[in-house]
Curated annotation (Swiss-Prot):
Its main location: membrane. The gene is exbB. Keywords: Cell inner membrane, Cell membrane, Membrane, Protein transport, Transmembrane, Transmembrane helix, Transport. Involved in the TonB-dependent energy-dependent transport of various receptor-bound substrates. Protects ExbD from proteolytic degradation and functionally stabilizes TonB. The accessory proteins ExbB and ExbD seem to form a complex with TonB. GO terms for cellular component: plasma membrane. Pfam families: MotA_ExbB (PF01618). It is a multi-pass membrane protein. This is Biopolymer transport protein ExbB. It comes from Mannheimia haemolytica (Pasteurella haemolytica).
């Protein structure tokens, strides 16, 4: 058990913050791809609304998933940090140092803060892109209503 706590103490920040950093890079990469796609999409080349919808919503699930799960990853880091704080408190033999406890708890909470930050950014992108999807679908429908109907 001692080895587990030593491992957690030395690697939790790197793993949790590294994972959140990776997720933020993936989110930014997908967001840049979507921005480039939306700026160049030609809705008139699509024959059906379904085909347009598939292309418009590509990568949005990834961005949404990052936005929904980043706080939980941060919370996991906080839980591990609090667990380590209690472990060290128990190992101290009842010698309570309030300053040390507060420092450890504040460091544990940084993981949640980073997770929330990643989630906020991802959800801002997701909601903005959701609006772009709706706009382009409505433009496509308006374009279709202006086309002369062909007899089948």
């Amino acid at each position: 058990m001692e080895q587990l706590f030593q491992f957690l103490e030395h690697h939790t920040d790197f793993v949790i913050l590294g994972l959140l950093g990776l997720l933020s890079v993936i989110c930014l990469w997908k967001a840049i791809e979507r921005i480039m796609f939306y700026s160049k999409v030609d809705i008139s080349k699509y024959d059906t609304l379904e085909e347009l919808d598939i292309d418009l919503t590509h990568n949005l699930t990834t961005i949404s998933t990052i936005g929904s799960n980043a706080p939980y990853i941060g919370l996991l880091g906080t839980v591990v940090g609090i667990l380590l704080t209690f472990y060290h408190l128990g190992q101290s033999g009842g010698d309570i140092d309030a300053a040390s406890i507060m420092v450890n708890l504040s460091l544990a909470l940084k993981a949640t803060a980073v997770g929330i930050l990643v989630a906020i950014i991802a959800m801002v992108f997701y909601n903005g892109f959701g609006r772009k999807v709706e706009e382009n679908k409505l433009k496509w429908l308006a374009l279709q209503s202006k086309k002369p109907h062909q007899a089948v």
